[in-house]
Amino acid sequence: NPGERPDIYGKIGNAGVSICCLDDLKKLYSGFELANSMTSVSMTINGPAPMLLAFFMNAAIDQECEKYISENGLENQVQQKIERIYKNKGVVRPKYQGELPEGNKGLGLFLLGVTGDEVLDNTIYQKIKTETLTKVRGTVQADILKEDQAQNTCIFSTEFALKMMGDVQEYFIDNGIRNFYSVSISGYHIAEAGANPISQLAFTLANGFTYVEYYLSRGMDINEFGPNLSFFFSNGVDPEYAVIGRVARRLWAKAMKNKYGANKRAQMLKYHIQTSGRSLHAQEIDFNDIRTTLQALYAIYDNCNSLHTNAYDEAITTP
């Protein structure tokens, strides 16, 4: 628990919500149906991405277990099992602190402190798990190469981080996780560190092809992992940004088709745009909305798949 570490206590929450265990993530997403087809969760996490992704998947599975328990009237039976588990452990069961927000019915909190496989028959649990993994939608950033190059939130060696990325992708393939992007290959941070549009695109595509080569070296099929790759670019007001997405898509598709023999689905480059944070000023702050609007217009005309526009006060404080 980072709250017990005096050397890092002051950093908690500086870059997002603090999640140090499965129960933390269950509390965070309580009330949201993570396996619903209308729910898609994007996690901007890199160094500890495999662990956070595991928390997320298990939280989604346990939510579906809770729904099964409720639909089959097993609440009392399961509650008794949980009480026995904690009596044997001799510790206090974790609980949600405070009142639930309006509209939150507490989905995800009934199994707080335990997991579905501890309270349900293994056959039932495995069926729920298999179905849930094919339904979850979202993205985890997990791009370790751009961390080395730009953002520097590295907690493992590059070699070990790449191995974990490969492990995650193999798990996605083996378990039929088709609606979740295992990596968001990111140029945004490279641009924020000073790269121009051309350099941003060059580094980002180079990183993408590095992942392709590495996954292929581990025996994975390009048509199975290709659809799990996504991209993330910055957008400024330089003229090259008007076509960065189209150029990226053409280069990626040609290489995936001609060099790697990928099918049409694996040739598709899906990308998210975030308007440029470093282009916004604390002094002439009234111009920030204009800058962001122009950048968003570039992105829309370039047919981005999704778009994030930065806040008016981005240059002053954490959004």
PLM feature spans:
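Catalytic alpha/beta active-site cores
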Residues: 1-235, 240-241, 259, 266-272, ...
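Amphipathic alpha-helical scaffolding segments
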Residues: 228, 250-251
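Active-site-adjacent loop and "lid" segments of alpha/beta metabolic enzymes
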Residues: 198, 285-295
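Surface-exposed loop-to-helix/strand elements on domain peripheries
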Residues: 270-279, 311, 317
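Flexible, glycine/threonine-enriched loop-and-boundary segments that flank and lead into catalytic domains
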Residues: 253, 276-287
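Active-site or pore-adjacent capping/gating segments
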Residues: 294, 305-319
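Extended amphipathic alpha-helical segments enriched in small hydrophobics
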Residues: 242-248
